[in-house]
A protein has these predicted regions:
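Compact beta-sheet-dominated domain cores in extracellular/mature segments
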Residues: 2-238
């Protein structure tokens, strides 16, 4: 299915008093909210406990703080707080790596950054056609916006988000030709982006975090248990 571009990306504003304003009311809100320079620190300083637990049920192995997870239900029962998750590894060795500490997650991602190789255009197209995660060694050549899609493989309705911007409540972002639907629990794939992107499974950038590193494709979020799960999103702009 060909995608329908309904993008109307805003620019980062000058509000620096907080990460972004909390959503009020139920009226549609098509404008993304600007992030403050300290947003990454502020948003993760005091994470709310998880409410109803929804299993990831990823099709790749799940690893928690470096240890394989055999029983995901038991893992959630033993943990009170949200997790920070990201794909690590290549090809058949890819895992969904979960961390209780966000700094540890970022360190693991950056270690993997140094192992990326330069791909030829032919290799890039072959890899993208396979719907597997691939990463480029020079993400600065990519678009600063991230585009998120209704379906896997960058198909279906699409909306794009510029750097240093976020949507704290995707249920208020209209979707579809008539704008009668919304983006909550809909996102199934992401485009390549120059910057890091985070998805959250609760409003106001709370809940579990799925971290999509800059320069990497995310053609099928369901592979990592994140298909139709995202409630809020951030393009970090760095």
């Amino acid at each position: 299915m060909a995608h329908r571009d309904i993008d109307d990306t805003g620019r980062a504003g000058e509000r620096t008093d907080r990460a972004a304003g909390r959503q009020q009311g139920t009226a549609p809100d098509e404008e993304p909210q600007p992030l403050s320079p300290t947003a990454a620190r502020d948003l993760f300083a005091d994470r709310a406990p998880l409410g109803l637990v929804r299993l990831f049920e990823a099709s790749v192995p799940l690893v928690l703080d470096g240890e394989p997870v055999e029983d995901e239900e038991r893992m959630h029962a033993d943990l009170a707080g949200p997790l920070h998750l990201t794909p690590l590894g290549r090809g058949d060795d890819t895992v969904l790596a979960a961390f209780t500490d966000r700094t540890a997650m970022l360190e693991a991602v950056r270690r993997e950054d140094t192992a990326y190789e330069e791909l030829s255009p032919e290799q890039v197209e072959q890899a993208r056609a396979s719907a597997k995660k691939i990463c480029v060694s020079n993400p600065t050549a990519l678009d600063a916006r991230v585009c998120f899609f209704e379906d896997a493989g960058e198909q279906g309705d699409v909306k794009c988000l510029g750097p240093e911007l976020g949507y704290p409540n995707l249920s208020r972002l209209p979707r579809g030709f008539l704008g009668t639907q919304n983006w909550n629990d809909v996102i199934s794939s992401l485009s390549w982006c120059r910057f890091d992107v985070s998805l959250f499974d609760a409003f106001d950038w709370q809940g579990n975090e799925f971290f999509a590193p800059k320069g990497c494709t995310t053609p099928d979020l369901s592979r990592f248990g994140w298909g139709d799960r995202t409630a809020s999103i951030v393009n970090w702009g760095s």
